[in-house]
Every structure is written in C-alpha cells, then in structure tokens.
Amino acid sequence: MAAPGKLSTCRLPPLPTIREIIKLFRLQATKQLSQNFLLDLRLTDKIVRKAGNLANAYVYEVGPGPGGITRSILNADVAELLVVEKDTRFIPGLQMLSEAAPGKLRIVHGDVLTFKVEKAFSESLKRPWEDDPPNVHIIGNLPFSVSTPLIIKWLENISCRDGPFVYGRTQMTLTFQKEVAERLAANTGSKQRSRLSVMAQYLCNVRHIFTIPGRAFVPKPEVDVGVVHFTPLIQPKIEQPFKLVEKVVQNVFQFRRKYCHRGLGMLFPEAQRLENTGRLLELADIDPTLRPRQLSISHFKSLCEVYRRMCDEDPQLFAYNFREELRQRKIKKKEKQDDAKSYRL
C-alpha cells in the first residue's frame, strides 16, 4: 500500500498528452461554463497527493474535462473512479482513459448539481459518522460558475448526513478561485472572513492547501486558483438546522462593513425590529458594535440558538424575508401614487 501523501507506482499505459487530447478532439474551453484546463500533470499529481492515500479508494471526480486530474487519480491505484461530466465534448477523451484502465473508470454524462452520488458506490463502504472518514473521496477542478453553489449544497448534505456523506465523513479536495479559497479558510477577524468561512468551518476542518497560478491553466483565467481540503467534523460547531444557520449568517454578512446589529435586524419585521434585535443580542451576549468579520463561530452558535428559541415562540418568524417586505412596501407605494394620479385626472 502506498504511504500517505504518495502516489502509487501503478501507471497507465502510454497515452496522448492532455494537450494532444484537446487537439485530437478539437476541444475548446467554454467561457459560459467557466472552463479552464489544467494541463501540467505535476500539478494534477500534487492535487491528488493532497487528497490523501487513494490506494484502493473509491473516488468521485466532478467536472473532469479533458481528464488531467482523472489520469493522476487513476495513477494513484484507486479501486474505482466515478467521473460526472456535463459537457459531451469531453466524453470521447474520457472513454480513451477508461479503455486504458479496464474496470477502474466509470463515466456518467450528467450534472454534478443533480447527480445522486449516494447511490453510486457500494453500501459496504459506509462508516458510522463517529469513525474515521470512509474510503470515499471527492476531488474536482470546479468551474468557477458552479463552485460556490456546489460547496453550499455539499455543506448542507454534511449537515443532514446525506448525498455524498451517506458513506460517512467523506473528504473533499476541490479547486476554487483563490479569493473564494481564502474566504473558505479565513480566520475570525481577517479581511477575507465571509459567509462562506462560517458555513464551511462550523461543519468542516477546512485547509487552503496551496495555490496554483492562473498561467498554469488553458485558457489562462484572470485569477489564481486555490486548492482546498475539507474534512467533515464529527460534531458540528453549531447544532442547529442548516437553513437556520445559513439565514443568520447571510443576514449578518450582507452588511459586512456595518456593525453586526444592522444585519441581524433584518431577521425581524420592521414593527418589532428594534426590540427583537436588542433582545437577540442581549440573550446571545454579543456586542452590537462588532463587525461581521469579528464574529467567531461561538458567537454565531449563540446567535443561532437564541434565534431558534425566538422562532419557536413565533412560528411565522423564520419565514420572514425583509426583502419581500420591502418589495411589498414598494408595490403599495406605487399603487397609492397611481391612485393619486387617477384622482387628479
């Protein structure tokens, strides 16, 4: 068995290079899909090494494209690699890899946002949540356009222990724009601290492992790329429903340059806003003049617990959306203006 962090000596037979595959099948990155190809196998090997020991592992790769990371995963001597690719142009090149690694590579033409990976691997791979992570991994060079909605979806799956996490605390090694990678791993108080920081870190151990310069990709993106590793925590740092945590965190960070009481106030209808915001902050023991980036996970834990109690007291509170209240107010204002015009006529 290969040592942790080392690729196995298992190698694929001689194949065209990724650059040759791109020419052979006349592949071009599609701007609409935010596609950027990583051609340097030294870098794809490094991504795979950082995922851990993959010998005899079951790997789910998202968005394989022309197959650069796919090759590195297969060279790690995995038991099985499942790839899900939305763009049909890449399927022939992936089939070439499948033929070079009989029985190892399974190709699905589909959308990672809707694919049911919980049904993809054997039930025997499942482990209790409290055990070590299962021998199942998620790896992917994500298109920029899908990376944020996809990680939020998977974080919710972690919270519910479903989707890819029916197998246990499945580890993920994924690429993001460098700025997004920095936000995911940002500490309390840092300028990069954001909604993503809190949502990821209350559920996972998050590490920004290394950065890949944009020039390593074809076509070259305007930004560098960060590789991030996620290991779900045995016990989440906030034990509340995902949607409730998400709502509190979103409201706080929508006014990221203001004091935290500004965003928290938007959790409540205008008529009770001042009173309820004060009550929330007092019961959670939060300084109302802290900025959003200064709030720790412990602060958010207290806020979510108090907000949950307030929602239990008022069952309609959680459904409240201040943007909808604002929209309705604008509609009523316009109706009054129209009525006034009609009256003058």
UniProtKB/Swiss-Prot annotation:
Q: Mind listing the UniProt keywords for this protein, alphabetically? A: DNA-binding, Methyltransferase, Mitochondrion, RNA-binding, rRNA processing, S-adenosyl-L-methionine, Transcription, Transcription regulation, Transferase, Transit peptide
Q: Which GO terms describe its cellular component?
A: mitochondrial nucleoid
Query: Which SMART domains does the annotation name?
Result: rADc
Q: Does the keyword DNA-binding apply?
A: yes
Going by the entry's taxonomy, the superkingdom of the source organism is recorded as Eukaryota
EC code = 2.1.1.-
Give the catalytic activity.
adenosine(N)/adenosine(N+1) in rRNA + 4 S-adenosyl-L-methionine = N(6)-dimethyladenosine(N)/N(6)-dimethyladenosine(N+1) in rRNA + 4 S-adenosyl-L-homocysteine + 4 H(+)
Alphabetical list of InterPro entries matching this protein: KsgA/Erm, rRNA_Ade_diMease-like_C, rRNA_Ade_Mease_Trfase_CS, rRNA_Ade_methylase_Trfase_N, rRNA_adenine_dimethylase, SAM-dependent_MTases_sf
Q: Which GO terms describe its biological process?
A: rRNA methylation; transcription initiation at mitochondrial promoter
| Binding-site residues for S-adenosyl-L-methionine, renumbered to this chain | 38, 63, 85-86, 111-112, 141
Once renumbered to this chain, the transit peptide range reads: 1-27
Q: Where is the signal peptide?
A: none
A Pfam family: RrnaAD
> Does the keyword Zinc feature in the UniProt annotation?
no
Say which family it is in: Belongs to the class I-like SAM-binding methyltransferase superfamily. rRNA adenine N(6)-methyltransferase family. KsgA subfamily.
Subunit architecture: Interacts with mitochondrial RNA polymerase POLRMT. Interacts with TFAM. Bound to the maturing mtSSU until the late stages of assembly.
Which NCBIfam families has this protein been placed in? ksgA
Tell me, in a sentence or two, what this protein's role is: Mitochondrial methyltransferase which uses S-adenosyl methionine to dimethylate two highly conserved adjacent adenosine residues (A1583 and A1584) within the loop of helix 45 at the 3-prime end of 12S rRNA, thereby regulating the assembly or stability of the small subunit of the mitochondrial ribosome. Also required for basal transcription of mitochondrial DNA, probably via its interaction with POLRMT and TFAM. Stimulates transcription independently of the methyltransferase activity.
Annotated protein name in UniProt: Dimethyladenosine transferase 1, mitochondrial
The organism encoding this protein is: Macaca fascicularis (Crab-eating macaque)
